[in-house]
Regions:
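Transmembrane helix and adjacent juxtamembrane "hinge" segments in multi-pass inner-membrane proteins
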Residues: 24-72, 211-214
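N-terminal hydrophobic signal-anchor/signal peptide
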Residues: 1-49, 161, 199, 220, ...
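Alpha-helical membrane-protein architecture signal
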Residues: 31, 35, 39, 73, ...
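A short, structured surface patch at a secondary-structure boundary
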Residues: 105-167, 211-219
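C-terminal terminal-structure detector
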Residues: 31, 159-226
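Membrane-interface alpha-helices
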Residues: 63-80, 224-226
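Short, glycine-rich, amphipathic interfacial segments at transmembrane boundaries or analogous
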Residues: 4, 8-15, 72-110, 171-192
Length: 226
C-alpha cells in the first residue's frame, strides 16, 4: 500500500475488517513498541524546546482575543480504551462540557479569530506533545475522538473500537489521506475509522516515518481544515 493521496477516495471502502484485536497488538511487537516510545519521547522533548516561543505567543494571543482559559482539556479514550485528558489550545468562545459535543463546522461562529488561524495549520494540537511525553499519546496513531462520539459511532460502525488497539496520535494515516475535520455523516466517519484500523493492522516504524513526512504537506493543502 503506497502513500499516494490519489488513492484515498477508494481506499477506505477496500479495507477488510476480518481480524481480531489481539492480532493488531501482536503485530506491533515489544521491540517496535519500545523504539516507537523512545522516538516519541525524544521528538516531543526536542519539539517542545524548539517551539516554546510559538507556544508562548499562541497562549498570549488566545488570552488577548477572547475570554476563557488558554487550554482546552477533554477526556478522550486512549490505548485499549483507557481514559486520559487531551490538551489543546482553546480555539472556541464556547467551551463544551464533554457531554453534549457539537463538531466544528466550516465558518463555525464559535471559533474565535485566533482560533480560526490555529485550526487551519493545526497549531492548536501542539500541546498534545505534553500528552506524548506522559505516554498517553504518540506522534503517530489514530486521532482520539470525544467520548460522546466514541459511544455514538461504536454503535453504528462495525469494529469501531479496534482503532483503540494503538496509542492515539497527533497525526495519523487517516489525516494524511484527507480524513480530518468535520464528519457530517456516519459514512464519512466510517472512511476515517477504516483508515485507522488499516494503520493498526499494518503498523511499522517505517510507516510512522512516512506519515510524519507527509503530514506537513497535508497541512499546507488544508483539506477539510476549519
Amino acid at each position: 500500500m503506497g502513500l499516494e493521496h490519489r488513492y484515498a477516495d477508494n481506499f477506505a471502502d477496500a479495507i477488510p475488517l476480518e481480524f481480531a484485536p489481539e492480532e493488531s497488538e501482536a503485530s506491533i511487537g515489544q521491540l517496535s513498541a519500545a523504539v516507537k516510545r523512545a522516538i516519541d519521547l525524544t521528538a516531543a522533548a526536542i519539539l517542545l524546546l524548539i517551539l516554546w516561543p510559538i507556544l508562548l505567543l499562541t497562549a498570549i494571543l488566545i488570552r488577548l482575543d477572547s475570554i476563557g482559559p488558554v487550554f482546552f482539556r477533554q477526556t478522550r479514550l486512549g490505548l485499549r480504551g483507557r481514559p486520559f485528558h487531551i490538551l489543546k489550545f482553546r480555539t472556541m468562545s464556547v467551551l463544551e462540557d464533554g457531554e453534549h459535543i457539537v463538531q466544528a463546522t466550516h465558518n463555525d461562529p464559535r471559533i474565535t479569530r485566533v482560533g480560526r488561524i490555529l485550526r487551519k495549520i493545526s497549531i492548536d494540537e501542539l500541546p498534545q506533545l505534553i500528552n506524548v511525553l506522559r505516554g498517553e499519546m504518540s506522534l503517530v496513531g489514530p486521532r482520539p475522538h470525544a467520548r460522546a462520539h466514541d459511544e455514538y459511532y461504536a454503535q453504528r460502525i462495525a469494529n469501531y473500537t479496534l482503532r483503540q488497539q494503538a496509542k492515539p496520535g497527533i497525526t495519523g494515516w487517516a489525516q494524511i489521506n484527507g480524513f480530518r475535520g468535520e464528519t457530517p455523516t456516519v459514512h464519512s466517519m466510517r472512511k476515517r475509522i477504516l483508515c485507522d484500523i488499516w494503520y493498526v493492522r499494518n503498523f511499522s516504524l517505517w510507516l510512522d516515518l512516512k506519515i510524519l513526512l507527509f503530514t506537513p504537506f497535508e497541512l499546507l493543502r488544508q483539506r477539510n481544515a476549519h
